[in-house]
């Protein structure tokens, strides 16, 4: 009896050890809507539960809807310009810069900074990567806020991060190309949609309004196919 019990325990230990060393169990996940398990027809969800799910879906999805709607509208501009003389607009893959502080009458940005020159551009990174041009701002504060479709910031590019002047490559989530010589760094977006909002500090003086124009004219983005290693300017 003892021998049988010992054999049984040994076999159990061996089988348990083999299971522990084997690959972890993977559960297949649906990849299409039709593969999802659906509730039975007689199941009725409480109204409070349905409202809670709807609220969560709205909060989760609204940033993306907002981003895509803005991109579809703003990129209709035939060239970099200012809509209503206030809001930067530009074709897909390019950006437009202000040359002064943002005007109080604008409503596109809810809480804008009051001491920077703004810019704005939208991209389709599944079509082609985009070169982001960073001029030498000297001691001036600057930052390029870059966002994906979820409005998550996807890069640390600016004076607070010790970024160097030069060229940076913004690519989509599936891009596998070669990085050209002369590119300081590669920024990968988690979505094909991305946008950039440069901010360049400017003193509220006539002298600095004149001085900031030179670097602002070199704040540009353009498709990788147009990159030649030379700093461009408007």
Where are these regions (language model features)?
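A compositional/structural signature for long, glycine/proline-rich flexible linkers
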Residues: 21-234
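Gram-negative bacterial Sec-dependent N-terminal signal peptides
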Residues: 1-22
